[in-house]
Amino acid sequence: MRVGVISDTHNPSVGVEPPAEIIPAFEGVDVIIHAGDIYQPSCLDWLEKIAPVYAVELGAGAHFQGDPRVVDMSRVLELEGHTIGLIHDLMVPGMAQEGTEYTPLAKHFPTGANLSSALETIFHDAVDIVIFGHTHYPVVEEFQGILMVNPGSPSLPKQIRRLGQVAVMELEPDRKSAKILDLSMFN
């Protein structure tokens, strides 16, 4: 299964629609996961022309009342035998600060910390993949057997208004991988 991963689109603040380069970047994806800061349902409508969408949004009730694609705060998805925890702002108990592309996630946890247990506190389930956003910094890292993916932002990478990134995950029952795609490769 091929999964498009996106976060922090901030539409319409940075444009009426997400960047058009997302279309070729997500070519052939079976589903799209959005890790929040969506702002408007029209963004998900636009993405849903590519593939079905699952999303989280802080305060989802404001603009997404009754929208089955979006839940507030966090959710757990089962895809291809993997349990995926989806959250916008990943602050795990014991975590020193938010993860950025410049520091391995291991540096954010105390020595001997059990990431799996900490994540179970957040998601109320054991997960083997975590998708998060908020930082606008792309991260793909496996830590303590858990694949951690932050796709960055397609429209505000590192809080700078320019073309940014998304991620694509490849899932099989016994395999998981993800890579960051720089959208400038598609224009």
What is the predicted function of each stretch?
Residues 1, 67, 172-176:
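Non-catalytic terminal accessory segments
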Residues 1-4, 73-107:
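Mobile, glycine- and charge-enriched loop segments
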Residues 2-83:
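Core catalytic region of metal-dependent phosphoesterases/phosphodiesterases
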Residues 10-14, 38-44, 60-66, 92-96, ...:
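Active-site environment of divalent metal-dependent phosphoester hydrolases
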Residues 33, 83-88, 147-150:
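Short hydrophobic-aromatic micro-motifs
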Residues 53-56, 101-179:
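Conserved beta-sheet core of the metallophosphoesterase superfamily
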Residues 63-69, 87, 158-166:
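Short, charged, surface-exposed secondary-structure boundary motifs
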